[in-house]
Amino acid sequence: MPRQLAGLLCVLFGLAGAPALACPFRATDAETPAASAGAAQVLALGGAGRLQLDLQRAPATLLHSGDLLIARYAEGHYLAHRLLEGNEMGADEGERLDLPRQVRLLFGALPLDGLPDAERERLQAQRQALGLCDRRASVSRYRVAGTEVYRLRGSQAGKPYHALYLLDGPQVHYLDSSGSDAFVEQLLASLRRR
């Protein structure tokens, strides 16, 4: 888990000195998976949208450290939640980013035209590092409970990897999981407002 988190942080910080390769990328719009009945536990997320997710089954272990919450399941996969920080999207010290806008730019929901060269190059390097340019990963965009959600799907060490970006007012909830497609689809389907 720490290795995966460290790798993700490297990706989100951008690759220093990475070539600014053209990477025209756009998230595909996706249908929200159908909700299933019942929840073993509810994960309530702080923020303007008062969002919550049904965990479907109780985790074997629940770990909380600072702003990070990790649920580990008996099958060996995990679900982690934290709020995305501006420096993870390339903000300089003291700079305040509009995080939802940065996520939309990264995943192609907004055009890169007209951005300063340095910002466009940073976004292209992040897309490259995430595997979006060479199609090692894919992104789908959902609208669930009035919330814009981006789902990055790829693999790490031969196992499925998913990252969910939930745009909630000025903040972005970041969830990642090594669970199956079905597990993540159940999470998406259960997203609602309290």
Set out the residue ranges of the language-model regions:
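Extracellular/secretory pathway and lumenal proteins
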Residues: G14, R26-D29, A137
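Bacterial N-terminal signal peptides that target proteins for export
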Residues: M1-L8
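Bacterial N-terminal signal peptides
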Residues: L8-A16
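Disulfide-bonded cysteine motifs in exported proteins
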Residues: L5, G17-A18, Q128
